[in-house]
């Protein structure tokens, strides 16, 4: 599998499914509240991979990594501030990533107005496909030797 269980490399999807699936699994609507899931995707995620001193939050001495989100997009509305705030729940449950207008990595803008500024999408796609082919070629023999249910289904062209 190339990505997490939901077959998506989209962090917004991962946040949503983390919250929803755990509520179902534990049959508890209070488990994994939105603020906690957002924290897991940022500060706690950085800490989990050993980079908490470099990324995960905006602090002096850390890399300036951030995204800007257009909260005027319909799927993120309505936006409430009083008596309750719903920006974090909107991000976790309703965002899909298309609302990201700006991305800064280590203080350098790499996406502005929703467009890549640092590289070409075609080049990224080409390099990703080339890298994937190399990985598959290296793993193919072991993959088939496992004779897993998924491998069998692929051999039968069922998936």
Locate the predicted segments by residue:
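His/Asp/Glu-enriched, well-ordered alpha-helical/loop segment
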Residues: 1-75
């Amino acid at each position: 599998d190339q990505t997490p269980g939901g077959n998506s490399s989209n962090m917004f999807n991962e946040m949503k499914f983390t919250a929803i699936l755990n509520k179902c699994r534990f049959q508890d609507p209070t488990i994994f509240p939105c603020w906690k899931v957002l924290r897991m995707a940022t500060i706690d995620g950085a800490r989990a991979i050993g980079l908490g001193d470099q990324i995960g939050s905006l602090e002096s001495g850390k890399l300036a990594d951030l995204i800007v989100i257009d909260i005027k997009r319909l799927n993120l509305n309505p936006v409430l501030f009083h008596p309750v705030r719903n920006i974090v729940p909107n991000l976790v449950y309703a965002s899909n990533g298309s609302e990201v207008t700006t991305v800064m990595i280590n203080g350098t803008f790499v996406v502005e107005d929703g467009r890549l500024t640092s590289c070409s999408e075609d080049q990224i796609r080409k390099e990703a496909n080339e890298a994937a082919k190399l990985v598959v070629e290296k793993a193919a023999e072991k993959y088939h030797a496992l004779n897993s249910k998924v491998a069998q289904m692929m051999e039968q062209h069922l998936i």
